[in-house]
Structures are given as C-alpha cells and as structure tokens.
C-alpha cells in the first residue's frame, strides 16, 4: 500500500501548494488576506486527501467531497488574482491545468467509492 505522500493525487496537490506559495510571494501586501486564504485552502486540500486515505467508505467520500469544494474555491481565487493582474498568464495556465487534473483525480477517487458500494 502506498503512503499518502506517494499518491499521485497528493503530489499534484502539493505541486499546486508550491506554485501558490510562489504566487503569494510575488503579490502586493494589500492582497495578503486573499493569498493567505488561498494557501490555507490548498493546505486543506492536502489534509483532506491525507485523511481520506486513512478512511474507507462514506467517510472517505466525505473528505474527498471537502477536497473538491476547496479545489473549486482555489480555482475561483486564482481567477480573481489573474483578472487583477497578479498572476502571470503562464503561471495561471499551469495552475488551471493542475487544478483541473486534481479535481478529476479526486472526483474519480470519490466516484470509485460509490461504484464499489462502500
């Protein structure tokens, strides 16, 4: 069995947190509340994936649903920062791609639980 850190879904989430940390470093201080919130949401995604990996059945599905909700919030905040001109197009494109991939991975994992009847 893989450890949590070895899961591809966890590694994708960790890469997103790394990129968001770089973005937070480069934005003006007046956006500190927004960037802090985005970093907390990204950390929460990592935590919910780790917790989901420890559970089975409905509990696992619950934590994966929380991860999906946090991913959606991150997508929205990244869009706001892009529209305000605080994220370069290349970085936003990479983040959007990783967030889409992460959402697909988490949704597939959650849906596999439902199809197994757990």
PLM ranges: what are they?
Residues 1-118:
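Amphipathic alpha-helical assembly/interaction segments
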